[in-house]
């Protein structure tokens, strides 16, 4: 989530639910107040910070995931420090492997990543998790997000995949 939707009361309630070590919400926050909205268009910094604080203060485990571009690469250390100060349990800065977006430049000294030819480790099986998209739809994993043909309506259907070697036929 970019953390920009809902109220602090809502995030506080979610924080009470996501309070186990294996439960967490990833907040995609790409820089600091002056740069986050360059990629996260129309996202209000103060709302994101208030929502994240409400979630964390209610006991929720929050992860900060930062996409690094040329315009925000100088803020990685400051963002990581802010994440610690706020009580985030984890911070990751990463360069997007997606096709470049108009107006956004890769950071300096960036090189195309080498293709990974090793085995794929399924996060759903390892973490016993699911993915909820920006519209609140439930999917078996983040790799299948926005694929309406694999939309799940019941969390028990996702839980069944946690005890198998193949979480979803689409993953074959």
Task: Give, region by region, the residue ranges found by the protein language model.
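Radical SAM/AdoMet-radical enzyme domain recognition
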Residues: 1-94
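Accessory C-terminal segments flanking Radical SAM cores
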Residues: 88-92, 96-172
């Amino acid at each position: 989530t970019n953390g920009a939707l809902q109220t602090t009361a809502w995030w506080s309630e979610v924080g009470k639910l996501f309070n186990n070590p294996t439960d967490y919400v990833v907040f995609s926050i790409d820089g600091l107040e002056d740069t986050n909205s360059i990629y996260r268009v129309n996202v209000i910094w103060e709302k994101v910070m208030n929502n994240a604080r409400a979630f964390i203060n209610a006991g929720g485990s929050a992860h900060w995931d930062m996409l690094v571009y040329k315009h925000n690469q100088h803020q990685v250390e400051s963002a990581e420090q802010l994440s610690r100060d706020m009580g985030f349990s984890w911070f990751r800065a990463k360069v997007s492997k997606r096709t470049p977006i108009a107006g956004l430049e890769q950071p300096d000294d960036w090189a195309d990543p080498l293709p990974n030819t090793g085995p794929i480790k399924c996060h759903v099986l390892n973490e016993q998790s699911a993915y909820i998209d920006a519209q609140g739809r439930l999917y078996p994993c983040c790799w299948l997000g926005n694929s309406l043909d694999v939309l799940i309506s019941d969390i028990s259907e996702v839980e069944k995949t946690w005890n198998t070697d193949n979480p979803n036929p689409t993953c074959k």
